[in-house]
Each structure stands twice: as structure tokens, then as C-alpha cells.
From Swiss-Prot:
Annotated protein name in UniProt: N-(5'-phosphoribosyl)anthranilate isomerase
Any one GO biological process: L-tryptophan biosynthetic process
The entry's keywords: Amino-acid biosynthesis, Aromatic amino acid biosynthesis, Isomerase, Tryptophan biosynthesis
Involved pathway(s): Amino-acid biosynthesis; L-tryptophan biosynthesis; L-tryptophan from chorismate: step 3/5
EC id: 5.3.1.24
Upper taxonomic lineage: Bacteria, Pseudomonadati, Pseudomonadota, Alphaproteobacteria, Hyphomicrobiales
Gene: trpF
Family to which the UniProt record says this protein belongs: Belongs to the TrpF family.
Single GO MF descriptor: phosphoribosylanthranilate isomerase activity
Top class in the EC scheme: isomerase
Alphabetized Pfam families for the sequence: PRAI
NCBIfam families listed in its UniProt record: PRK01222.1-1 (NF002295)
Record has Isomerase as a keyword: yes
Length: 224
């Protein structure tokens, strides 16, 4: 599959293997105790060994301190660190200097002004992940099953490398790709039967929908 597809919040060998067999380019393991997708570093490391070299391994953290990152990086040996909290550019630079790993920085989007937060990170992060802002009362920065208005990305500079996230599933991924021209997508709740429970049939449907969308849009991936 030409597009980067990340299945996030993986917790079982069955789900990890199935995601990669379908063509997932990235596998995400979440280290955030409040999340139903939280996994212990050693458990994630064992799962990652099953698919290492076949897909990128992403450690998803939320405002983690160095001690926590030390444990996660040691156990998982990730290819990418995804920082999904309020980490500022200085913190991103520090993390990159310590661990020598590419960093994907998540930014929450609800309105056009949220895109102003991109500039301070340019030249620092290796890729952005654009997620929807969590609903009121949610303790989770992502994985809430909500989307943002994808048309907001019309104003985005075409040179910005990003992964589209936020409530993506088999029913809406076609529209999301048509509107944004995204070359990388992320899903978690969109392939679950319950919070934290990956559904293999929903994974199948998601990848089928991505392939259908890829087949009908311009080769360049530009917006139609």
C-alpha cells in the first residue's frame, strides 16, 4: 500500500500481526495509564519483536518525563516517538537529543487558528499528527472517536508532512482523503468494537476503504 497507515493502540499479538498483514506501515503502542489502550513497556516490546522490520514501531506518549521515556525506549526500541501531549518545541528538541529518534508531534485541531501552532515546530519535528481536539470532559488527548473539519487543512502549506488522525474509520476515510489529499493516516477507535479492543473485521474494512480511495484519486495525492 503506497499510503502510510498507522494502526494505533495495539495490545495483542493477533491485532499486531493482522494490522501488518493488511499493509500497516506503522504500529502504535500507547503509554498513558488513563487510556484503555495503555500497555506496559515490556509487553509492548514483546509484541514489537513479532513485526520488527515489517512496520515502523511507534511509541505514543503524553507529556512523559525522561524516566518514563528511558523505560519505554529501552523495552520497545521504537523507530519513532509520538509526543501527544503539550510538549513544546524545546521539549521536542530535548527528546530528540537524548534518544536520537524521529519525533512525530500531535497537534489538536478544532478551528483555523489551531494551525498557527505548527510554525514553532517546523524544522524540529519530523512529522506532525493532526488529531481532533478531545470533547469536553475527556481525559484522553486522542482516541476519542471524533473528527475535525478536514477543510481546515486547505490552508496548510503543502510542504508540511503530516499524518491525519481523529475519528477515522471505514465510513469516512474516503471523504477525508478526498478533502485533504493526506498521504498518511492513523486510526485507533475506528477499528475497535469497544475502547481498547481491536476488531479484525473493522481493520479489514478500513484498509479496503483506503485502497478504494487510493484507486480513484490522482497519483500525486493532491486534493481534487
Amino acid at each position: 500500500m503506497k499510503m502510510d497507515v498507522k494502526i494505533c493502540g495495539l495490545k495483542t499479538a493477533e491485532a499486531v500481526e493482522h494490522a501488518v498483514s493488511l499493509g500497516a506501515s506503522h504500529t502504535g503502542f500507547i503509554f498513558f495509564p488513563k487510556s484503555p489502550r495503555n500497555i506496559e513497556p515490556d509487553d509492548a516490546g514483546r509484541l514489537a519483536e513479532r513485526i520488527r522490520g515489517r512496520a515502523k514501531i511507534v511509541a505514543v506518549t503524553v507529556d512523559a518525563d525522561n524516566d518514563d521515556l528511558d523505560e519505554i525506549v529501552s523495552a520497545l526500541k521504537p523507530d519513532i516517538l509520538q509526543l501527544h501531549g503539550g510538549e513544546d518545541p524545546e521539549r521536542v528538541l530535548t527528546v530528540k537529543a537524548i534518544y536520537g529518534l524521529p519525533v512525530m508531534k500531535a497537534l489538536s485541531i478544532r478551528e483555523a487558528s489551531d494551525l498557527d501552532r505548527i510554525d514553532p515546530y517546523l524544522g524540529i519535528v519530523d512529522r506532525f499528527l493532526f488529531d481532533a481536539k478531545p470533547p469536553a470532559g475527556s481525559e484522553l488527548p486522542g482516541g476519542n472517536g471524533v473528527s475535525f473539519d478536514w477543510r481546515l487543512l486547505d490552508a496548510l502549506d503543502g510542504s508540511v508532512d503530516y499524518m491525519l488522525s481523529g475519528g477515522l474509520n471505514a465510513e469516512n476515510i474516503g471523504e477525508a482523503l478526498a478533502l485533504t489529499g493526506a498521504r498518511a493516516v492513523d486510526t485507533s477507535s475506528g477499528v475497535e468494537s469497544a475502547p481498547g479492543v481491536k476488531d479484525l473485521k473493522l481493520m479489514d474494512a478500513f484498509f479496503d476503504a483506503v485502497r478504494r480511495a487510493e484507486a480513484v484519486r490522482p497519483r500525486s495525492g493532491s486534493k481534487t
